Amino acid sequence: MKKSERSSRKRLSATVTSDLIDYKNIDLLRRFISERGKILSRRMTKLTSKQQRSVTVSIKRARILALLPFINRDS
């Protein structure tokens, strides 16, 4: 895949600390989910491995508790 064919999604800054990442903080978690409802990769979010794991676990918990949808049906 050529670089021009890749998605040109703007990357997020890694200013998140691990103590703020919580499954109840839906506004923060939505920053790490794509338009289609997928969890964004570390390359896209620029998080450390520990932060990415924490975000992933929090998103999965929020999905199970129905705070976040599993898929985004709006698009």
Swiss-Prot record:
The signal peptide annotation in the UniProt record is none
GO MF, one term, reads: structural constituent of ribosome
Domain of life (superkingdom): Eukaryota
What are the GO cellular component annotations? chloroplast; mitochondrial small ribosomal subunit
What are its GO biological-process terms? translation
| UniProt keyword terms in alphabetical order | Chloroplast, Plastid, Ribonucleoprotein, Ribosomal protein, RNA-binding, rRNA-binding
Family membership = Belongs to the bacterial ribosomal protein bS18 family.
Task: Please name the Gene3D superfamilies in this protein's record.
Answer: Ribosomal protein S18
Where found in the cell? Plastid, Chloroplast
Q: Which residues form a coiled coil?
A: none
Answer whether the UniProt record assigns the keyword Ribosomal protein to this protein.
yes
Species in which this protein is naturally found: Psilotum nudum (Whisk fern)
InterPro entries xref list: Ribosomal_bS18 (IPR001648), Ribosomal_bS18_CS (IPR018275), Ribosomal_bS18_sf (IPR036870)
Q: What is this protein called?
A: Small ribosomal subunit protein bS18c
Q: Give the chief site where it resides.
A: plastid
Subunit architecture:
Part of the 30S ribosomal subunit.
